[in-house]
């Protein structure tokens, strides 16, 4: 689950980190009033969406004119912002963040992720702030400095100082940076973050450290113990199909291909997508129905897959370990009848009662293609998607 910038900065403020005074506004009038409340003669207005690249897409504006703030809010509120990180539809803008303007002398980067290779939270800092950290990692990886947090000892001030030295901070800035580092590390653990970015973390004209931006991703598996964070969820930013799938405990991710995939098990699902690609097809989705697949869940899975008009064929790949293949076959038949599937369906069954499952499919009156192997399934579904 992701947070909006204004939500991230509210958390920063709770932990005593330096952020700009700002207000998230629902209307153009609120945005104008927020600028008046903040005071000063320059403000920054930002569209609030779960995507980067807002500035290049026109979703960020620096202005000294309140009427320009009104015009900006009237233009964007209720519309979709399309950036390089969104699909062609973009994401809806329901709030505008109005902030005081900060004079920038230098831009830095500070972020943290859960690194699965080290099984630790890893902080990353760089002098290359304001640009995509992925670009820095690819082109100049030596400019990214890391601090690995030991879960037994927790974050240590010396780690912040080490990063600060590498960033070229002076003694005053070093103290401020250490406070930011320690606060972020505590926040990361307290709220079960999966990702944290401040890009840019700036040095102001006065020489102070300031959190100019904020990006937070939460570990969805931990939301049960994070009620405050869970209440910050903005469903309007979610893919409608992914949100619908979550209600039925289906793991679904929309892609841009034409072969729908329904699989039980995340690893098998990824392998299925790979082999579809290998045989010249393009998966339209990742969909894991889980180990406890039922007729109802299979039916919902079909509905979700077929809600994508790009899908020209569906591959169902089931390994019967926890579930019986004959039961899954009956579920597939029931789902196809209920949903009214009009595209070719290729089914590959292996494992418990696989032969019985294939027999159930063969005895149905439906035009379901039974595959003899995973390779055969991939070849059949790619041909079907191409209309062959």
Swiss-Prot record:
Keywords: ATP-binding, Ligase, Magnesium, Metal-binding, Nucleotide-binding, Tricarboxylic acid cycle
UniProt signal peptide: none
Self-association state and partner proteins as the record states: Heterotetramer of two alpha and two beta subunits.
Enzyme class: ligase
Catalysed reactions, semicolon-separated: succinate + ATP + CoA = succinyl-CoA + ADP + phosphate; GTP + succinate + CoA = succinyl-CoA + GDP + phosphate
Binding-site positions, ATP: 46, 53-55, 99, 102, 107
GO biological process, one term: tricarboxylic acid cycle
Main function: Succinyl-CoA synthetase functions in the citric acid cycle (TCA), coupling the hydrolysis of succinyl-CoA to the synthesis of either ATP or GTP and thus represents the only step of substrate-level phosphorylation in the TCA. The beta subunit provides nucleotide specificity of the enzyme and binds the substrate succinate, while the binding sites for coenzyme A and phosphate are found in the alpha subunit.
Protein name as it appears in the record: Succinate--CoA ligase [ADP-forming] subunit beta
UniProt-annotated binding residues for Mg(2+): 199, 213
Listed PANTHER family: SUCCINATE--COA LIGASE [GDP-FORMING] SUBUNIT BETA, MITOCHONDRIAL, SUCCINYL-COA SYNTHETASE BETA CHAIN
One Gene Ontology term of the molecular function aspect: ATP binding
Gene behind this protein: sucC
GO-annotated cellular components: cytosol; succinate-CoA ligase complex
Pathway as given in its UniProt record: Carbohydrate metabolism; tricarboxylic acid cycle; succinate from succinyl-CoA (ligase route): step 1/1
Cofactors, names only: Mg(2+)
Enzyme Commission identifier(s): 6.2.1.5
UniProt cofactor note: Binds 1 Mg(2+) ion per subunit.
Family: Belongs to the succinate/malate CoA ligase beta subunit family.
Binding positions for substrate per the UniProt entry: 264, 321-323
Domain ATP-grasp, residue spans: 9-244
Species, as recorded: Shewanella pealeana (strain ATCC 700345 / ANG-SQ1)
């Amino acid at each position: 689950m992701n947070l909006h910038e204004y939500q991230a900065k509210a958390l920063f403020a709770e932990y005593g980190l330096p952020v700009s005074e700002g207000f998230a506004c629902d209307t153009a009038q609120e945005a104008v009033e927020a600028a008046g409340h903040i005071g000063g003669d320059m403000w920054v207005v930002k569209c609030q969406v779960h995507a980067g690249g807002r500035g290049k897409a026109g979703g960020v504006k620096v202005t000294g004119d309140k009427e320009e703030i009104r015009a900006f809010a009237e233009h964007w509120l209720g519309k979709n912002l399309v950036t390089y990180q969104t699909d062609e539809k973009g994401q809806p803008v329901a709030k505008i963040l109005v902030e005081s303007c900060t004079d920038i002398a230098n831009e830095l980067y500070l972020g943290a992720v859960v690194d699965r290779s080290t099984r630790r939270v890893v902080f990353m800092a760089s002098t290359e702030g304001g640009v995509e950290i992925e670009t820095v990692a690819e082109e100049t990886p030596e400019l990214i400095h890391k601090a690995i947090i030991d879960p037994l000892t927790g974050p240590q001030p010396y780690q912040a100082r080490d990063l600060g030295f590498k960033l070229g901070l002076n003694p005053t800035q070093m103290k401020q940076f250490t406070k930011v580092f320690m606060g972020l590390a505590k926040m990361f653990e307290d709220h079960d973050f999966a990702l944290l970015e401040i890009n840019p973390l700036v040095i102001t004209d006065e020489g102070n450290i300031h959190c100019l931006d904020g990006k937070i991703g939460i570990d969805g598996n931990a939301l049960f113990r994070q009620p405050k964070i869970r209440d910050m969820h903005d469903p309007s930013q979610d893919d409608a199909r992914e949100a619908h799938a979550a209600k039925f405990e289906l793991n679904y991710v929309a892609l841009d291909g034409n072969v729908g995939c329904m699989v039980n098990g995340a690893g098998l699902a990824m392998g299925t997508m790979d082999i579809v690609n290998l045989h010249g097809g393009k998966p339209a989705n990742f969909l894991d129905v889980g180990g406890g697949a039922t007729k109802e869940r299979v039916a919902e899975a079909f509905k979700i897959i077929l809600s994508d008009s790009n899908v020209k064929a569906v591959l169902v790949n089931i390994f019967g370990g926890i579930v019986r293949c004959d039961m899954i076959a009956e579920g597939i038949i029931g789902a196809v009848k209920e949903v009214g599937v009009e595209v070719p369906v290729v089914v590959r069954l292996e494992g418990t009662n696989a032969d019985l499952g294939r027999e159930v499919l063969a005895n149905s009156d439906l035009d379901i293609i039974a595959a003899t192997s995973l390779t055969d399934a991939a070849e059949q579904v790619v041909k079907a998607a191409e209309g062959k």
